[in-house]
Amino acid sequence: MYSLLEKHLNFYESKNENIFNYALLSLKQEYENKDQEIFNSKWRKENGYIPHGTRQRTLITIFGKLTYKRHRYLIWNKNGYRFIYLSDIALGVKKYQRITTHLQIKILSLIAKGKRYQDISDCFPHLNISSNTITNIINRTKLDSLETIIMKKTKTINLDQYLYVNIDDTFLNLKENNKKQQYRIRVVLFHTGYDLEKSRPDKKILKNSRIFMFLNKKNEYYDNQLIFKKIQNIAKIFYNNVDKAKIIISGDGASWIRNCQRYWPNSIYILDRFHMIRKLRQLFNPNNKLMQPVYENLRTAFFNGNYQEMIKILSKDWFNDQYKNLKLKELKYYLQQNEQNQGISNQKYDFNIGCSIESTISHHIKWLLGYGSKAFSKKIYLKILTLHFATVNKINIIDLFKENFIE
């Protein structure tokens, strides 16, 4: 049985290798035919390009390593003769290029789709692409800032009634000048609610979702007024009628998010359910038979936007433990601070559909790092995020690459 399986696998591996070899042979003929066409051309002779032997060149293509011959020419300029390879120019192959432009764009497209380095290497097992090679491709790619790309390439969406803005920070270690430093990534997720056609009972799909981010060192000061002004400007690039819509802003209860109405007059603040429920579970463990009813009552009161009921429950003496009493006091203070901006009482309204920022950060920020302790270069990671966020924002990445690869 084992020999039969081995024979089956070897058969398909052999066929796969034959296909790649055929493609490489065909590509070699194309390249060398182009070179011969230039060699025989009247144009080449009339412009004074003098043949000076042939040289081999090796390129890494999507099919494997391609080695082909092309003619070398001498051409006179004001400083004397210099060597030139006309077929390289005609085929778009740069002087020190090792990997075809086609393969580079394939790799960058995978980066833009959220693939990690190992995923990309696994896509091309026959090429043995290293992490350094992928990093070098990203590093050499010229990219505008995410904001500039959005301004140039975004198609505006018409808003109906609500625009949801989910905001949160996450912190990552990135390298700058070969030193690890902690950076804050402030992620902003925009959407217009759930897509009723695509959503299922067990999986909600956001409609017209767009994403933006700010990247700064952890200890750098953010001017909240400027931040919200930038968020509003980005929202107006993504959507029409932003000033007339109801803006539903959700977050973890940080003071700068709670006070959004100071900077965005037509906005409403709602505390992210995830953070409140997590705090309740940590203090009133639902797996504890004594605490489970308390947890359920608090949870129900929270979902109903009943702030007074929550305070009433939390005002009772539940614990003899000093540490837990301190946490209980902190929880009451957290509730009070959020209710100052109606973050609790707004839970009961129909427009409260929850907040998706935690999963957004997990899927689009931490996933790209691989959830490990690795530290990317800040420059490289910013380019990775820019490419990925552009894809999430429905921007045609291939068009973006064409602009960057055509000189």
Describe each region flagged by the PLM:
Residues 1-29, 75-407:
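Catalytic center-proximal scaffold of phosphoryl-transfer enzymes
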Residues 24-99:
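Basic, low-complexity segments
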